[in-house]
């Protein structure tokens, strides 16, 4: 099986392989297979739509974790006219699991901050698999405070399995760094738009996730814990991760129905990794629309709406 395909995509992989075989055969003399190719392409479109219309939460998670899925750096290249990365927390070190800096989007100056996982082994180690340490969150906060001083909107791109749980991170105040970001982001006097582009894992995601708008890509996930971790705690069996994924309600449509997400951005057929440029353009359009709306508000209106939004989380009506 092609490594770019997930297990539930095997029927799609088989059809695409048949189409390629026919195209290769048509290169020979007096061979015309266009009718067959068109028929298979129609079948491929229908089969793909059928599969992606009925995805389980576990399958959505596999898409969110796909190794070819666009990361923060990929969106920076396509969505922004300019980007100047800024490094370091001015206290301990520069955590490469968080990247951020000044950028322009359609000529508008913003501060962009996001998790970065890494593609190959070397980069994954450099980026710590996209799992930040305290210095990463403190770097993010430093950039947010800089944005506030200069009146720049903040855009965050969330994609992490969670904050780094190592002893080194704990000894430098991991929980305090995350909590500090939650407090400061709630009070930041500039617009904040948070977008979950892949995995939104626990406090490690939430430390970049407090804002005026929360956007999720169609096949992104957002939860308090990974399904594997949840299954290990609840049932003492990580093998029940598929069941945990269903119970966690981690998909974008489910979270939107609960009022935790404001907008879900549709992904290209097959997921963002099938057409990263198209995905970036769709997300860019959404972010520009949201920025237009938020920048019409006064600082007082912005903060009041943000507080109201945050206080609404978890409310329910008793039967």
Curated annotation (Swiss-Prot):
UniProt-annotated location(s): Cytoplasm
EC number, UniProt record: 2.1.3.15
Top EC group: transferase
Principal subcellular localization: cytoplasm
Gene Ontology CC, one term: acetyl-CoA carboxylase complex
Transmembrane region(s): none
Superkingdom of origin: Bacteria
UniProt keyword Hydrolase present: no
Keywords, sorted A to Z: ATP-binding, Cytoplasm, Fatty acid biosynthesis, Fatty acid metabolism, Lipid biosynthesis, Lipid metabolism, Nucleotide-binding, Transferase
One function term, GO molecular function aspect: ATP binding
Listed pathway(s): Lipid metabolism; malonyl-CoA biosynthesis; malonyl-CoA from acetyl-CoA: step 1/1
Family of the protein in this entry: Belongs to the AccA family.
PANTHER family: ACETYL-COENZYME A CARBOXYLASE CARBOXYL TRANSFERASE SUBUNIT ALPHA, ACETYL-COENZYME A CARBOXYLASE CARBOXYL TRANSFERASE SUBUNIT ALPHA, CHLOROPLASTIC
Protein name (Swiss-Prot/TrEMBL): Acetyl-coenzyme A carboxylase carboxyl transferase subunit alpha
Organism: Stenotrophomonas maltophilia (strain R551-3)
Gene this protein is translated from: accA
């Amino acid at each position: 099986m092609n490594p770019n395909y997930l297990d539930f995509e095997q029927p799609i992989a088989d059809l695409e392989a048949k189409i390629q075989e026919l195209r290769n055969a048509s290169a020979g003399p007096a061979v015309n297979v266009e009718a067959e190719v068109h028929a298979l392409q129609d079948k491929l479109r229908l089969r793909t739509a059928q599969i992606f219309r009925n995805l389980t939460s576990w399958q959505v998670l596999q898409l969110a974790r796909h190794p070819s899925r666009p990361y923060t750096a990929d969106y920076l290249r396509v969505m922004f006219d300019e980007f100047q990365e800024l490094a370091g927390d001015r206290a301990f070190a520069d955590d490469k699991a968080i990247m951020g800096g000044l950028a322009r989007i359609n000529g508008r100056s913003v501060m962009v901050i996001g998790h970065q996982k890494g593609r190959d082994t070397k980069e994954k180690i450099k980026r710590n698999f996209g799992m930040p340490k305290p210095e990463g969150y403190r770097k993010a906060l430093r950039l947010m405070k800089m944005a506030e001083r200069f009146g720049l909107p903040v855009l965050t791109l969330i994609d992490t399995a969670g904050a780094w749980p190592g002893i080194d991170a704990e000894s430098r105040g991991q929980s305090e760094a995350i909590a500090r970001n939650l407090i400061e982001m709630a009070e930041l006097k500039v617009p904040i738009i948070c977008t979950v582009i892949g995995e939104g894992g626990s406090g490690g995601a939430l430390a970049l996730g407090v804002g005026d708008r929360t956007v999720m890509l169609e096949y992104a996930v957002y939860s308090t814990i990974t399904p594997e971790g949840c299954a290990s705690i609840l049932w003492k069996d990580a093998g029940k991760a598929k069941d945990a994924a269903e119970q966690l309600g981690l998909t974008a449509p489910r979270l939107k129905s609960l009022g935790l997400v404001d907008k879900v951005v549709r992904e290209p057929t097959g997921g963002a990794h099938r057409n990263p440029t198209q995905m970036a353009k769709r997300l860019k359009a959404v972010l520009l629309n949201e920025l237009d709306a938020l920048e019409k508000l006064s600082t007082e209106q912005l903060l009041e709406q943000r507080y109201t939004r945050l206080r609404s989380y978890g409310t329910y009506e008793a039967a």
